[in-house]
Amino acid sequence: IIQSWSDEARSVALLIQGFDYLYLFIYPAWLALVAIALGTRLGGRWQPAGLVTGWVVLVAAPLDAVENYALIQQLLHGAGAAPAKLALWCALAKFALIAVAMGVLSLALCVWISRRLGRERASR
């Protein structure tokens, strides 16, 4: 597929990969901070869960960087089995880590909302 792209299409794809390098510094840091903040706010078992989730999601950044590198290599030098496999495995691992983190964050957010609503009802 890459070989059928024009030079302009490849340039655009390279630009998008460059922007993705900037984005990979934002989403892991944001998710990690939210995980740690929610864990701290909820306390108890949630505190270490938030800390572990924060660290786990930070592993997504280097996986994303390696995935981007492999994709850029294919854009510059043509499709190859090794870079394609590397990009695939890094992407799968990255999305698995993010999915786990989002699951923990969603559950923690539900607990936080539930506790907050419970306090409001109790204060009436």
Residue ranges and their predicted role:
Residues 1-13:
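Extracytosolic (periplasmic/ER-lumenal) interhelical loops and adjacent juxtamembrane/interface segments
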Residues 42-61:
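Interfacial segments of alpha-helical transmembrane regions
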Residues 22-41, 101-118:
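Transmembrane alpha-helical segments in integral membrane proteins
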Residues 7-10, 44, 78-81:
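Alpha-helical structural elements of signaling/regulatory helical domains
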Residues 15-29, 88-100:
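Membrane-interface loop-to-helix entry segments
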Residues 9, 53-56, 83:
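N-terminal hydrophobic alpha-helix used for membrane targeting or insertion
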Residues 121-124:
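Short, intrinsically disordered terminal tails adjacent to the first/last structured region
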Residues 59-109:
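Alpha-helical transmembrane segments of multi-pass integral membrane proteins
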